[in-house]
Amino acid sequence: MQMADLEKKLENSVLPPLLKRELSEKILKEEISEEYLVDEIISETIRAYERTLVEPGEAVGVVAAQSIGEPGTQMTMRTFHYAGVAELNVTLGLPRMIEIVDARKEPSTPTMTIYLNDDFKGDREKASMVAKNIESTNVESVSEDISVDLINECITIVLNTHQLESRGLTVADVIESIKSKMKLKIEDHENVLNLKIKTPSLKALRKRLPKVRAIHLKGVQNIKRVIIRKEVDEYILYSEGSNIKEVFDIEGVDTTKTTTNNIVEIQDVLGIEAARNAIIYEMDATLGNQGLTVDKRHLMMVADLMCTDGVVKPIGRHGIGGEKASVLARAAFEETVKHLYSASMRGYVDELGGVVENIIVGKPIAMGTGCIDVCIDKTYEEGKEL
């Protein structure tokens, strides 16, 4: 049996293109040559596919909401340590689920899972080098003490040589970075730097102190810490903080697998389709972490709804809930008086096309048998049975 023969058999079937291709590849891989067996496999696949289809008029939104919401009541409310990674806090459970559906611009604990290229992933030293290049280093993180010297009227930085060496920096690098960010006169006394300004005063020195501490020396902005962990036969990096755009530019990073839990950042860097996949993955992982299983199609429906306009929108009054076409549906969700008052002022007419608004006015909803109109042929003969 050749691929062309299988394609011909599946050409007019109801199966989607991806399923057709996967089925063909599976039949060829198993080397099934008997035509009656191939026909039986195709028929059974079509029957199984048709059983999974949603019935016309099914309330898929309500079913999805119930299927996700009911297990959600069993979820924990706390922030946990990420399994197997020491000292790295990650928000899990219900708070994480709320973050996802609210499309928060910044998660409470942004993290990245950074995979390495083939040349780096098996070598601990190379993985450590990539981690050092990613981890953000500022003046404070390589200093033993940063304080205002009232006698000499300057800011004194006592550098930690061990920290400098471990992060691949020198005193000259620190001086150069400070000079590029601030107009200061720097006196170098081995590992002690004195920073002086033109018109010194206690107020002026104290004002500059936080800025000096925060001067960026090396690494990726917003990545506070990177942890290396060996999983099976490769090293994987876990970061505290997220900046996927800059991390992708670091040598040794596998851009095809590296990801972040910041969905809005994924949308900005990789696009809306990647953000949709991230929403599905994050919801599934959050539920799975609690030992809960929800059919992925319910999660896909939520993700599709959030991403349908090309940008990630929250499910709530500031997003999808507040953009419903029906005035009554918007009023029933939240901010009732605001929506009714605004609609009255503008003379809006509610077409009663949805579910909520029909329930409010006591009409049958367009769902299940309610979405079917029975049509009678008026030309039938009188007395003849239909």
Swiss-Prot record:
**Enzyme group, top EC level?**
transferase
- Provide the catalytic activity annotation: RNA(n) + a ribonucleoside 5'-triphosphate = RNA(n+1) + diphosphate
| Record carries keyword Coiled coil | no
Taking the first listed entry, what is the main subcellular location of this protein, grouped into a coarse class? cytoplasm
| BP GO terms, sorted | DNA-templated transcription
InterPro entries per UniProt? DNA-dir_RpoC_beta_prime, RNA_pol_Rpb1_5, RPO1C
Summarize subunit and interaction data from the UniProt record for this chain.
Part of the RNA polymerase complex.
Q: What is this protein called?
A: DNA-directed RNA polymerase subunit Rpo1C
Q: Which gene encodes it?
A: rpo1C
